[in-house]
């Protein structure tokens, strides 16, 4: 019996790629478009959210996954849900942000493969993605919102597994809010 929870669209092609990573898309049309533009490492879950089974399958083939889900709220929620699932199976997770297009298919049609490749190379690690997503919710010129951002950022950063990550991203949050890194440690 065919089980969507255990299959990834285009895995048969992507697993042969020499890229050393897979690009995970929200829909199969995005994966098809990426393949047409030369990105042979793209896969998509088949009409279902990413599952633990999908994550385990990806981990068999590559050390890194780049999430390229849609930029809408549903896509960003799916990105946030996927990150811990992928990390749990030992994958490095990066997130690609697209400006000016809702998904990879639209981006490629508007801007082309070269520009997508540049974005791919600049994709954020999960810590950068989560901190930047949090920052975008606040007006950091307003003191009350700066305080709220810093409180939420501190909660987020405290979940990062290494002291080095906490130091780096604590300093970035402090810089974004215009305070010293020392004040962030208090």
PLM region spans:
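Phosphate-handling DNA/RNA-contact segment within nucleic-acid enzymes
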Residues: 1-61, 65, 78-79
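A charged alpha-helical hairpin associated with nucleic-acid processing machineries
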Residues: 15-22, 51-65, 69-186
């Amino acid at each position: 019996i065919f089980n969507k929870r255990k299959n990834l669209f285009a895995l048969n092609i992507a697993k042969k790629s020499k890229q050393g990573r897979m690009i995970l898309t929200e829909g199969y049309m995005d994966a098809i478009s990426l393949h047409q533009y030369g990105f042979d490492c793209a896969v998509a879950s088949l009409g279902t959210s990413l599952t633990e089974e999908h994550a385990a399958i990806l981990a068999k083939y590559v050390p890194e996954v780049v999430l390229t889900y849609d930029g809408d709220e549903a896509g960003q929620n799916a990105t946030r849900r996927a990150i811990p699932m992928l990390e749990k199976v030992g994958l490095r997770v990066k997130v690609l942000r697209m400006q000016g297009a809702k998904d990879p298919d639209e981006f490629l049609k508007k801007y082309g493969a070269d520009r997508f490749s540049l974005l791919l190379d600049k994709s954020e690690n999960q810590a950068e993605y989560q901190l930047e997503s949090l920052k975008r919710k606040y007006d950091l010129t307003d003191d009350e919102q700066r305080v709220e951002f810093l409180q939420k950022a501190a909660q987020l950063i405290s979940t990062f597994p290494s002291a080095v990550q906490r130091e780096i991203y604590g300093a970035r949050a402090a810089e974004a809010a215009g305070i010293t890194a020392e004040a962030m440690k208090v």
